[in-house]
From Swiss-Prot:
Residues 1-30 form the signal peptide. One of its GO terms (molecular function) is receptor ligand activity. Has a role as neurotrophic factor involved in neuronal survival and neurobiological functions. It comes from Pongo abelii (Sumatran orangutan). It comes from the Eukaryota. One of its GO terms (biological process) is visual learning. The lineage of its organism: Eukaryota, Metazoa, Chordata, Craniata, Vertebrata. This is Chemokine-like protein TAFA-2. Keywords: Cytoplasm, Nucleus, Signal. Belongs to the TAFA family. PANTHER family: CHEMOKINE-LIKE PROTEIN TAFA FAMILY MEMBER, CHEMOKINE-LIKE PROTEIN TAFA-2. It is found in: Cytoplasm; Nucleus. GO terms for cellular component: cytoplasm; extracellular space; nucleus. The gene is TAFA2. InterPro entries: Chemokine-like_TAFA, TAFA_chemokine-like.
Amino acid sequence: MNKRYLQKATKGKLLIIIFIVTLWGKVVSSANHHKAHHVKTGTCEVVALHRCCNKNKIEERSQTVKCSCFPGQVTGTTRAAPSCVDASIVEQKWWCHMQPCLEGEECKVLPDRKGWSCSSGNKVKTTRVTH
């Protein structure tokens, strides 16, 4: 093989290695940035949404939330959005005290106290608490 061909091949391999190392560095940097991301104290953010329908064609939604609450607060729902609420509300299952429904909706605690419903006219949204 001639010397020029070997130089080009070596240069090509070197460029590929640099590209892979750069790409790998960005992936690692991105992963570390995601792990280090903090939610401002007293606030919540949705990190994942899930939506599907069951056999009865009733839409089911769930979400994963990341909150950073002040002492004495826990993750809850206010005006249909994730929020930090007084821990006693959740401990005693006084769900409607955290004002989980939108304005104009009526809040009712479910009979088994494992959640609440928000109703307006003939529309009912039920929320079950899972830990």
